[in-house]
Amino acid sequence: FLAPHAPQNQGMFNPIKITLPDNCWLNAKWPAPTIGCTTLTSAKITSAVWQALAQACPDKVTGSTNADCNWFVSSVVAPDGTTDVFSDLPAGGWGGTPFGDGMNVTEDPLGNCMNMPAESAELLFPIAYESFELRPDSGGPGRYRGGLGAVFKVRYLSDGLLSMESARTLQGSPGVNGGEFSDVQRQTKIYGDGTSEVIGGLDEAGGWKSPLLSNVPFTHGETFMFESTGGGGWGKPLDRDVEAVLDDVLDEYITFNTAYDVYGVVIDKEAKTIDLEATKVRRSELSAA
């Protein structure tokens, strides 16, 4: 990576020292739980290594992926009365790169998994997908934006219990080289009467609940909503091409407010065009802030 034309051998790793004190997060001892060791933990290690390398070679490193498998399993009662298990790994975005935006809604590179098609899940289990769509403003801002996460809504057509491992609920995916963090993830239970409750992550009042869910009950007609995060941005948002910002707004990847507040691009909402002079002024204001 740092010397791409040099032959790889053991000597290249001699300068690297890894320190893992006993009973730390990366060197857990019995009886500490380690179910997420190959998923949540390994993805965070990769993210941390990217952040470290970015200090030495920011032109080669990408923003962090969502760095989560977001694995959930749920029991469901089939029409014949038997119990089945529905499982999926809702994906998030990958980080912005030195040459382009990150990919939208793609499984973490360590997972070697694919998104389950909603149609396949509905054929196999008593559930209905109410939503599987891109989540606006979820990618980290940057010269090259982080890929977007998604909004997953799964309605139960029977009773069930849901367990899930997730993270990125207090801080999103970090960017590099001036790129910014993505939005955070959130798990929500929507009741049959339309009211909702955040069961993992931050609620509107700023309260937080652990995203490690265990046997959360759902009854027929209730919906589980998961909002996955995007990837971290690469480069400063004010360096992003203004036409790319406009395209993002028109594609509903970002909102008008984000275009103005973060990217400093002034867009006429009616004409869907850029006010270049006002944009120059706005970007100067944000640069001086």
Segments the model singles out, each with a brief description of its role:
Residues 1-289:
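Glycine/proline-enriched, intrinsically flexible loops and inter-domain linkers
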